Amino acid sequence: MMLKKAQTTDNLKLPISLNATGWLESSPDWSNISGLVAGVDEVGRGALFGPVVAASVILPASSFPQLMTAEIKDSKKLSHSRRVQLAQQISTLAIDWRIGYATTAEIDRINILQATLLAMRRSVKKLKLQPILCLVDGNQPVQDLPILQQTIVKGDERSLNIAAASIMAKVWRDDLIQRLSTKYPMYDLKSNKGYGSKKHLLALEKHGASPLHRQSFRPCQISLD
């Protein structure tokens, strides 16, 4: 049954302290959790082109030392090659991980915030194993998600599960944009990954927006008449 409101921990005691320093998964309180925990994060929210993509990742406790040794962190702070390496490692170590996304048309129809939450919800619902708790990056709980969740601002710097989700979503989306760049070479997507670089903005002024540009974003609202 779908819930009308997100089931958050506002009135419940989270078994881990958000005031702890370092990774939450290394906190002594983590052992209080009996069940699977998923990290949820998104990428592409600020892009002008392509979908917003989310990932949900469930890591086993046995993987935490390996990922900390590998210096896992927010995907934006990693080089492309390092992200790909870590994504391969996460894919091998994870109990389960899934991708969800919202299309450009959905972004334009329901706005980028709601599309982001939709992508997150889709990624969680694709998991073959249901977690007892979702750690969600940011301050917006995912609506219509019948699973206990906790939002964490800068969660990709606080939780290994969220950092892993950030990396999986980023690598998946970058690969998609790379493939789409051959169809739309004029926008320099190979370099900017759909974000508003100078070359991208100049190309929009010259060629107009493609069908995969977000028409609800001002830089894409260009008339060539």
UniProtKB/Swiss-Prot annotation:
One of its GO terms (cellular component) is ribonuclease H2 complex. Keywords: Cytoplasm, Endonuclease, Hydrolase, Manganese, Metal-binding, Nuclease. One of its GO terms (molecular function) is manganese ion binding. Transmembrane segments: none annotated. Residues 35-225 form the RNase H type-2 domain. One of its GO terms (biological process) is mismatch repair. Manganese or magnesium. Binds 1 divalent metal ion per monomer in the absence of substrate. May bind a second metal ion after substrate binding. It holds the Pfam family RNase_HII. PROSITE patterns: RNASE_H_2 (PS51975). It comes from the Bacteria. Its cofactor is Mn(2+); Mg(2+). It catalyses: Endonucleolytic cleavage to 5'-phosphomonoester. Its EC number is 3.1.26.4. A divalent metal cation binds at residues 41-42, 137. It is found in: Cytoplasm. Belongs to the RNase HII family. Endonuclease that specifically degrades the RNA of RNA-DNA hybrids. This is Ribonuclease HII. It comes from Trichormus variabilis (strain ATCC 29413 / PCC 7937) (Anabaena variabilis).
